[in-house]
Design a protein with these regions (language model features):
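Pore-lining transmembrane helices
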Residues: 2-228
Length: 228
């Protein structure tokens, strides 16, 4: 019970911070939308193909498909976030490839911060030289930011996921009610529920609860956002 309450409290803190980022950070809402898209392109494919079709049904090919997508969440975020902030596609791909091997949140943070650096360099550096300067400056800067953020994420956000994963062994029904309810609420907030579950590294039963909650809330979101 204490583990569940601790994990839930930490999860609420994360939600508050990301909501604050969405509304107060420069172009925060666009960045969060790109993070959600990156999570869908990586986590959702992993949830279905790796966890469901692969591990549960034993289809090895689809398990490989899910594992491939799931391992590239950082690259997806590193590409989609700069694109959402108006960075040239070439530079967006440069940023994304540079964070290869890192998780979705380090890729997101690096992509977000370096986007402003790239846009500044594009304005200040003469045309023709901007590509070389951005390659020399932005690529190592992106990798450096991701390297700094990676242990921070592993020691904080991923620990929340581990607490929830361990808690399901003691009280799976209660944890399912809390986690499923929170993710459903998040689905209507600025932070994507898909992004949240991938950021905290849910696996196993909690990952299944997250996937089901996301799937169920998607119908509510579709109806709520239909244009009359």
């Amino acid at each position: 019970m204490i583990q569940i309450l601790t994990g839930t409290a930490l999860l609420l803190v994360v939600l508050a911070l990301f909501t604050l980022f969405s509304y107060k950070a420069p172009q925060g809402m666009k960045a969060m939308g790109a993070l959600a898209n990156a999570a869908c392109a990586s986590f959702l494919v992993e949830a279905f193909h790796f966890s469901l079709f692969g591990e549960q049904m034993g289809i090895k090919f689809l398990e490989g498909v899910g594992a491939a997508n799931g391992s590239l969440g950082g690259v997806a975020a590193g590409i989609l976030v700069p694109l959402a902030l108006g960075v040239s596609p070439v530079y967006a791909v440069l940023v994304g490839l540079t964070v290869s091997g890192f998780g979705i949140l380090p890729g997101f943070i690096a992509g977000y911060l370096v986007s402003f650096v790239i846009k500044f360099l594009e304005k200040k550096v003469p045309a023709g030289l901007d590509l070389i300067v951005i390659i020399v400056v932005a690529a190592p800067l992106t990798r450096g930011i991701a390297m700094v953020m990676d242990p921070v994420v592993k020691n904080t956000l991923l620990q929340i996921g581990q607490v929830l994963i361990q808690a399901q062994a003691t009280s799976p029904i209660l944890m399912g009610l809390i986690l499923g309810g929170l993710i459903t609420v998040v689905a209507t907030a600025p932070l994507s529920s898909m992004a949240l579950t991938s950021i905290i590294g849910l696996t196993g039963v909690p990952m299944g609860i997250g996937a089901l909650a996301v799937f169920g809330s998607s119908f509510m979101n579709y109806q709520a956002h239909q244009v009359p």
